[in-house]
Amino acid sequence: MAERSQNLQDLFLNTVRKQKISLTIFLINGVKLTGVVTSFDNFCVLLRRDGHSQLVYKHAISTIMPGQPLQMFENEEAAS
């Protein structure tokens, strides 16, 4: 079995980016953002919605909720 070199945060963000899954991001100040992740790095997430991009700093994010169930690992079955 190959070792997982990515951390969970990067694996999660890369999965929603590749699958173009719409998600909701809640910021620590209570603001709710929705969109699709187009890119991310160690400090920020680029979110796209209605043809506009929005750069969100990770330190401002409280919670990320995908709009559908994710399968991030090969042996993981989708929740019923």
Swiss-Prot record:
Coiled-coil ranges per UniProt: none
Keyword terms, alphabetized: RNA-binding, Stress response
Occurrences of domain Sm (ranges): 10-70
Cited Pfam families: Hfq (PF17209)
Keyword RNA-binding among record annotations: yes
GO MF term (any one): RNA binding
One GO cellular component term noted in the UniProt record for this chain: cytosol
Source species, domain of life: Bacteria
InterPro entries, sorted: Hfq (IPR005001), LSM_dom_sf (IPR010920), Sm (IPR047575)
Signal peptide positions on this chain: none
GO biological process, alphabetically ordered: regulation of DNA-templated transcription; regulation of RNA stability; regulation of translation, ncRNA-mediated
NCBIfam families: Hfq, PRK00395.1
Function: RNA chaperone that binds small regulatory RNA (sRNAs) and mRNAs to facilitate mRNA translational regulation in response to envelope stress, environmental stress and changes in metabolite concentrations. Also binds with high specificity to tRNAs.
Family note: Belongs to the Hfq family.
Quaternary assembly: Homohexamer.
Protein name as it appears in the record: RNA-binding protein Hfq
Organism: Sinorhizobium fredii (strain NBRC 101917 / NGR234)
Lineage of source species: Bacteria, Pseudomonadati, Pseudomonadota, Alphaproteobacteria, Hyphomicrobiales
Recorded name of the encoding gene: hfq
